[in-house]
């Protein structure tokens, strides 16, 4: 029992300890509440202090907003505190979880530490005892002592000399026997047996000594393994010459021994080879080893040159030890050899001689002078394998060239004969011994690069001779050329054999720029293609020649540009022409060459070939200070020849591209072809047969040439500007050659008797070396027209075809335009011809203002003008003939309008060159005539304008607003003038508008204006009565017309929508409800439309006496809408009054028809809720209105429509009563529309106005 009790007590006391409680980083909740309370008190205190300080500075809204923000922030903080307090109720459980997590992490750490400690126990292997040495124990047991090395501490006995000599003799005997019995000794072995070893020599390669390890005589190769040969010693039979420091291959006295480390490695390798392959394997191994060492010595010398010589950076070396091959890529900085395209290979040929192969730009070189010099250096004599016949080498690809460093050492295309075996060799002395020469790699590179540079310059020289003469290019040295780059300049062009780059001696900036381009890859190749592509040497030479031509081009262009700049020509470098535009210029040269080839086939070889000229040329653009902005002198020069070509052209920029709109080439005559006319000579100029060239030599580009070129170019520009202006005006003309025409013949042919005031002046030629002619390309034919250029003045004559310029009845089919350049900046223009059958006032004011003179006696007129070119020629839109043709247009308009007015019997009160005053009569009211002024256009693009006699303009700002009738008529004129302007601007798509039709329209529109005038008069009369009378009756009337606030109930206005559409608007004002200040304004719109009605009368010559005119359609449809239902009584009154008028007019017409026995008219059928075909459809523009109005010859029948059933009975009754219709007295009802003649318009308007007054009176009652 005590034990059990004791055990129980131990169990209770050994219970597990409590989990440790975590209190780190925990803050009591009381502290948080304390801190937040203090912070809230601090913020409230600060806010109250701030608000008390800014009482006067801030508004109450801003202060309240500030205090509200503080309260909101504090509220958010206390919400967080409240959240923490709520969470505190369950914080004990969370704390237990934290304690558990911490305890689990501690237990995990203890278990991991236990695993690491257990694993560390395996690292005590070194503390174990070693195993027993059984082998040593057995030796002791068996021999009585361990077998230990002595390390030569115990000296052995030396061999005696006799023993050694005996052994060596035995070895010599064994070696002699074995060499005698062997059949596979290499042919190149030269061996000697002595001193117990066999000394084997291979000339110019190596010497090796071998021996055997026993005295066995081996006669069977299969038993060779029983007694193999062993390596004794080795040395190279070549090396560096201590006297010259160069490599010697043909002197056996110079040898090279291997260092100890290399000797040991070679001994081990040779013994293995002798054991497995015998002497043949020995030869192959040492032969390769010797060749590798030869190539190594060469590579070492090349590396020395690459570091410490002038060759540094100018060649690349690729040394391959596994193939005993060296590839030297010279001119490594040049793009031609950048990818190993020009290189020399050094290696061992099939005869074991040091040999080479030379590749120039991817082609194998064989048999040229450079190869002969290299053969002497390498002591080689070449012979072709095909019995001495030289074969061409194939071009290798880029991949093959790059892989050339991996080629086989056997050069199968050629063989080499060592000079020692040739008794005829030049390097053999009199004793028959070969003179040993050191191999100089610097000399090898010099020979290669010099010969390559020489071949390039020779090819450049030969190709330059095909383009230039021998005086322009000559060979100074194998590496230098003398070039004639301009008539007065020459330079030396050379190549640097060391680098392969070209250069000029004492270069100018232009030559330096060309040198940089020559030594750079062609621009056609990108950087990627340069690294990957193969650039043939022929392409490089062609590119060099092109750049030389470009140099000549730039130098010649600079000289020409300097001469032009000194003679006041301005260069323009902005213009860049495309190939298509340049072809327009070269087309002149092609046509001229074809023409010269046809005319003179024998001398065509003496001219410069056009194809060579066009291969390289440059175009420059020049202009004079006073020239128009788009005119230029074009100069073309070529790098092949010193000749230059000249054009005068107009060039403009269209959508960013420069376009040649017109051009003329200038042609030149030689001195032997010069011909001048005497001042009094009037016969036709015949061109002599002379050679005409499009180019001029550089020697003739002197000051006199450019002075004459300036005058000629200016004349050609003026000539073309006039030609173009005539073409823009669509005027047909013929340009006469002033040098060849006869005045009397021309004028007599066209019956022109006028003596020209400006006689043709005698012009003299300027004494210059070259006569300048111009070829005109305006004609489509291939013939070339020549103009004598060296003149001080310019004269020209045009025959103008009088198509629409003047009426043929009053003039002639041909007019004359004379142009003369009086001075350098003054040009005289004159247009003259016949003018008859017309009497026009031609005052001195017209002559001075319009430069127009009319000679009625001689039936002749002329318009002249003097133009100051210094002020107008440089304007962008200069029209030299503007004044002349504006005056001619005004004269043409005056003649045509007067002719129309006279034929139509319109009263013309006055006329001049500016205005025509006419009288328009009102056929319905004789007291309403109007005086209209027809203002003639100032410009050819302007139209005529209509003005009232008492007004000077059609704008409403200057019209007297007190006269409403004048205002409305002026508005009509404004619409007409607008239509005339639009018709003029679109004249190519529209028909001509007759002035008679316009005048007739003004006559027909008068009744409408008079009707509106009558309405305004009635309203004015009522207003006057209401304002002056104060009795009861008048007060009652005033209350009818006015509202209680004094505002009138009725207003009237006329809206002119278009020329054929007008609108009568009655504005009805009324009070709404009991509020007297609130006014509602309604409007009643009545549309008036003009409709043609010509089929009852035939037109005659006098339109004012004609009864035919327009009908008026009055429509109420726009007013019969839902908003106007409250005016139902008004419309009933209107329709009632109009129906009464219809009945009255019907009776009058019937009575009048019976009394006058007029021709019965067919009844017009009623229409159903739609417009008749007579009703003109409203147009969308003024042009359509007046065009339709002007057509008076078309008869339009009303469209028949089915009437409604409730209208048929009234229609039948009306048609019976109106059996005949008078054309001048028509009044027809069409549902809610009315069709009436002009004389009934006043009655209809009166009835409508009276109805409005009746409605107002009923409303008042």
Curated annotation (Swiss-Prot):
A GO cellular-component term linked to this record: core mediator complex
Chain spans, region Disordered: 1-21, 413-435, 1193-1220
Main location: nucleus
InterPro entries tied to this protein: Med14_N (IPR055122), Mediator_Med14 (IPR013947)
Compartments where found: Nucleus
Transmembrane stretches, start-end: none
Domain of life: Eukaryota
Compositional bias segments (type: Acidic residues): 417-427
Alphabetical list of Pfam families matching this protein: Med14 (PF08638)
Molecular functions per Gene Ontology: transcription coregulator activity
Residue stretches of biased makeup (Basic and acidic residues): 1-11, 1205-1220
GO biological processes: regulation of transcription by RNA polymerase II
Record's keyword terms, sorted: Activator, Nucleus, Transcription, Transcription regulation
Keyword Transcription regulation: yes
Function field: Component of the Mediator complex, a coactivator involved in the regulated transcription of nearly all RNA polymerase II-dependent genes. Mediator functions as a bridge to convey information from gene-specific regulatory proteins to the basal RNA polymerase II transcription machinery. Mediator is recruited to promoters by direct interactions with regulatory proteins and serves as a scaffold for the assembly of a functional preinitiation complex with RNA polymerase II and the general transcription factors.
Description of how the protein assembles with itself and partners: Component of the Mediator complex.
Family statement: Belongs to the Mediator complex subunit 14 family.
The protein, known as: Mediator of RNA polymerase II transcription subunit 14
Organism: Candida albicans (strain SC5314 / ATCC MYA-2876) (Yeast)
Lineage: Eukaryota, Fungi, Dikarya, Ascomycota, Saccharomycotina
């Amino acid at each position: 029992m005590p034990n059990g009790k004791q055990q129980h007590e131990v169990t209770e006391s050994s219970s597990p300890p409590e989990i440790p409680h975590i209190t780190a980083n925990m803050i009591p909740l009381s502290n948080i509440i304390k801190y937040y309370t203090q912070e809230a008190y601090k913020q409230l205190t600060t806010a109250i202090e701030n608000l008390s300080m800014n009482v006067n500075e801030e508004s109450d809204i801003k202060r309240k907003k500030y205090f509200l923000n503080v309260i909101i922030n504090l509220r958010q903080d206390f919400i967080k505190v409240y959240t923490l307090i709520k969470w505190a109720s369950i914080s004990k459980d969370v704390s237990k979880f934290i304690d558990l997590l911490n305890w689990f992490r501690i237990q995990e750490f203890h278990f991991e530490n236990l695993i690491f400690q257990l694993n560390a126990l395996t690292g005590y292997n070194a503390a174990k005892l070693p195993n027993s040495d059984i082998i040593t124990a057995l030796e002791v047991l068996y021999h009585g002592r361990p077998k230990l090395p002595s390390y030569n501490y115990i000296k052995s006995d030396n061999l005696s000399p006799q023993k050694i000599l005996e052994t060596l003799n035995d070895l010599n005997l064994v070696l002699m026997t074995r060499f005698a019995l062997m059949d596979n000794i290499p042919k190149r072995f030269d061996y000697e047996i002595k001193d117990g070893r066999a000394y084997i020599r291979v000339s110019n390669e190596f010497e090796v000594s071998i021996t055997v390890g026993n005295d066995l005589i081996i006669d069977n190769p299969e038993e060779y393994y029983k007694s193999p040969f062993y390596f004794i010693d080795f040395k190279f039979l070549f090396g560096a010459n201590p006297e010259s420091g160069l490599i010697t291959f043909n002197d056996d006295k110079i040898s090279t021994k291997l260092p100890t480390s290399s000797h040991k490695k070679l001994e081990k390798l040779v013994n293995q080879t002798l054991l497995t392959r015998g002497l043949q394997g020995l030869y192959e191994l040492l032969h390769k080893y010797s060749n590798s060492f030869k190539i190594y010595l060469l590579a070492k010398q090349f590396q020395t040159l690459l570091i410490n010589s002038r060759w540094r950076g100018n060649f690349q070396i690729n040394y391959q030890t596994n193939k005993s091959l060296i590839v030297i890529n010279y001119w490594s900085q040049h793009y031609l050899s950048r990818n190993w395209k020009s290189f020399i290979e050094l290696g061992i040929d099939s005869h074991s001689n040091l040999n080479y192969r030379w590749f120039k730009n991817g082609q194998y070189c064989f048999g040229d002078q450079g190869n002969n010099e290299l053969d002497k250096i390498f002591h080689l004599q070449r012979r072709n394998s095909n019995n001495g016949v030289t074969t061409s080498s194939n071009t290798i690809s880029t991949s093959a060239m790059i892989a050339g460093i991996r080629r086989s050492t056997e050069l199968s295309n050629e063989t080499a004969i060592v000079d020692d075996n040739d008794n005829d060799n030049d390097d053999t002395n009199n004793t028959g011994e070969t003179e040993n020469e050191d191999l100089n790699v610097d000399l090898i590179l010099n020979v290669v690069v010099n010969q390559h540079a020489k071949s390039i310059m020779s090819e450049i020289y030969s190709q330059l001779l095909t383009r230039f003469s021998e005086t322009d290019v000559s060979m100074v040295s194998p590496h230098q050329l003398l070039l004639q780059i301009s008539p007065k300049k020459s330079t030396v062009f050379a190549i640097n054999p060391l680098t392969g780059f070209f250069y000029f001696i004492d270069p100018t900036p232009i030559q330096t720029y060309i040198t940089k381009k020559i030594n750079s890859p062609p621009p056609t190749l990108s950087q990627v293609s340069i690294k990957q592509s193969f650039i043939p040497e022929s392409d490089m030479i062609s590119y060099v020649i092109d750049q030389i031509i470009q140099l000549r081009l730039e130098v010649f262009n600079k000289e020409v540009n300097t001469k032009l700049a000194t003679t006041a020509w301005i260069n323009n470098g902005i213009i860049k022409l495309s190939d298509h535009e340049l072809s327009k210029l070269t087309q002149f040269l092609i046509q001229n060459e074809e023409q010269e080839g046809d005319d003179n086939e024998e001398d065509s070889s003496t001219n410069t070939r056009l194809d060579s000229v066009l291969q390289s040329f440059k175009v420059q653009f020049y202009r004079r200070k006073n020239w128009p902005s788009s005119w230029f002198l074009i100069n073309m020069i070529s790098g092949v020849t010193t000749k230059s070509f000249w054009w005068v052209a107009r060039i403009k920029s269209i959508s960013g591209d420069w376009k040649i709109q017109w051009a003329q080439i200038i042609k030149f005559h030689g001195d032997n072809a010069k011909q001048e006319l005497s001042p009094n000579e009037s016969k036709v100029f015949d061109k002599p047969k002379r050679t005409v060239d499009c180019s001029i030599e550089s020697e003739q580009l002197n000051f006199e040439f450019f002075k004459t070129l300036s005058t000629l170019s200016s004349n050609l520009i003026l000539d073309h500007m006039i030609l173009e202006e005539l073409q823009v005006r669509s005027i047909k003309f013929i340009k006469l050659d002033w040098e060849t025409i006869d005045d009397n013949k021309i004028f007599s042919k066209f019956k022109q008797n006028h003596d020209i005031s400006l006689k043709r002046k005698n012009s003299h030629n300027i004494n210059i070396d070259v006569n300048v002619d111009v070829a005109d390309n305006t004609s489509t034919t291939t013939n070339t027209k020549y103009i004598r250029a060296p003149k001080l003045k310019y004269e020209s004559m045009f025959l103008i075809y009088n198509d629409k310029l003047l009426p043929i009845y009053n003039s002639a089919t041909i007019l004359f335009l004379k142009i003369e350049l009086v001075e350098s900046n003054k040009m005289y223009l004159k247009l003259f011809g016949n003018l008859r059958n017309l009497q026009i006032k031609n005052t001195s004011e017209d002559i001075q203002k319009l430069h127009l003179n009319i000679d009625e006696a001689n039936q002749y007129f002329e318009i002249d003008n003097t133009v100051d070119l210094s002020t107008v020629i440089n304007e962008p839109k200069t029209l030299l003939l503007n004044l002349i043709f504006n005056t001619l247009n005004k004269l043409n308009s005056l003649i045509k309008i007067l002719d129309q007015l006279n034929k139509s019997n319109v009263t013309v009160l006055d006329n001049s060159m500016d205005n025509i005053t006419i009288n328009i009569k009102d056929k319905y009211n004789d007291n309403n005539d109007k005086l209209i002024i027809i203002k003639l256009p100032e410009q050819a693009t302007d139209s005529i304008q209509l003005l009232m006699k008492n007004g000077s303009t059609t704008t409403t700002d200057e019209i007297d607003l007190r006269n409403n009738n004048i205002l409305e008529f002026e508005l009509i004129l404004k619409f007409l003038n607008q239509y005339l302007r639009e018709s003029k601007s679109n004249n190519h798509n529209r028909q001509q508008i007759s002035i008679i039709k316009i005048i007739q329209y003004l006559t027909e529109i008068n009744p409408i204006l008079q009707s509106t005038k009558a309405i305004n008069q009635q309203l004015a009369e009522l207003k006057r009565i209401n304002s002056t009378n104060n009795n009861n009756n008048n007060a009652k009337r005033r209350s009818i017309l006015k509202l209680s606030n004094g505002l009138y109930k009725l207003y009237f206005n006329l809206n002119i929508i278009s020329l054929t559409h007008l609108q009568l608007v009655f504005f009805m004002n009324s009070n709404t409800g009991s509020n007297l200040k609130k006014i509602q304004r309604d409007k009643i719109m009545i549309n008036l439309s003009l409709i043609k009605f010509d089929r009852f009368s035939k037109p005659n010559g006098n339109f004012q006496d004609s009864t035919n005119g327009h009908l008026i359609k009055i429509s109420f449809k726009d007013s019969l809408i839902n908003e106007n239902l409250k005016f139902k009584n008004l419309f009933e009154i209107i329709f009632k009054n109009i129906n009464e008028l219809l009945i009255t007019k019907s009776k009058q017409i019937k009575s009048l028809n019976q009394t006058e026995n007029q021709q019965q008219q067919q009844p017009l059928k009623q229409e159903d809720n739609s417009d008749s075909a007579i009703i003109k459809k409203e147009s969308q523009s003024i042009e359509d209105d007046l065009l339709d109005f002007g057509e008076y010859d078309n008869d339009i029948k009303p469209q028949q429509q089915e009437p409604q059933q409730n209208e048929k009975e009234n229609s039948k009754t009306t048609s019976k009563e109106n059996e005949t219709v008078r054309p001048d007295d028509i009044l027809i009802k069409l549902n809610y529309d009315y069709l009436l003649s002009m004389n009934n318009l006043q009655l209809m308007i009166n009835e409508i106005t009276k109805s409005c007054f009746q409605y107002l009176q009923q409303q008042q009652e």
